[in-house]
């Protein structure tokens, strides 16, 4: 759950990829500055990697191993009794001989730091690059071959978690990241900045013009945009963010904090989650990897109501037990006794799955090469010209053979009944992963 902050004394930042300064208060974020060191000088902050609902993540130099690592500083409120720490330890306790182990971003170290806003947990893991959401988007796409490779790794990663009796719970394109090439570790900080650019900073300011104080840093730092430097990225992925993870034997009884576009219908309506709901999210991820957009997230707003509208438009009518369920003003399922709640109204199959698959664009011929360690060579831009028909640019779609094969895979994943969905081994063995595209 995201940290709930009070009305902020700080002005919002004008930068895009930064945390909300309002989160710098007691119970909130720990103020981190470039050049600071932690754990008796072992980890030195070099750049910013990202921020989330209750954390900031920084690129740091590990002087002991001469590598760059990620330091995730959790809000002090979330650090207290941090329930995900056991899950992270369990995930990292497996053997690297197990299939899928290599595609999980394992916990390398953990420590606590005291600051003006409280007692903060810091999690150390391998530093990673851009996410699938960044690379497979409106601006960038993966080639067909790269899509198969990345999707196959995602299946293997999820299989590893399930073999430990753990569900990820938030298996989305934002939580699947590409690894950085080893050359990054050979760079000192000045050389790192020469490649990535100097950190973009903006001073933190108060609303009344008073001094910032100790609770906030003197400046916020914009996160690195690794999608802009694909030469640093490998085609190998790692899965991150286990905040929504749970034991298969003891699933949560409330709705997961997963983006609704990736939630299965039973997770939305009945809060029933498990292996099958992870498989549904995997199906959403596979479509995003191949197409560059979310199958159930391009209509309305970011609520379960609109996600379900897209599901109905794509897959057809909901099972009878869900058809008359009502939704509150925020788009979440409401109690049947709430007469003010709204019933889902949508024409089924307005945008069927088969059409969505047929409309996936393929990369221009000759745009990809066989070097599996070079992600840059596997990425293309949708604006690339394919050729001209009657003086107008034409778009090339994936072949009918691939469309039929991919549709077969996805249609067997996106089943309303969880027990009817493909298992992970069946997905891994599906012909689409071996198709020459």
Give a label for each model feature.
Residues 1-437:
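Intrinsically disordered, low-complexity regulatory segments of kinases
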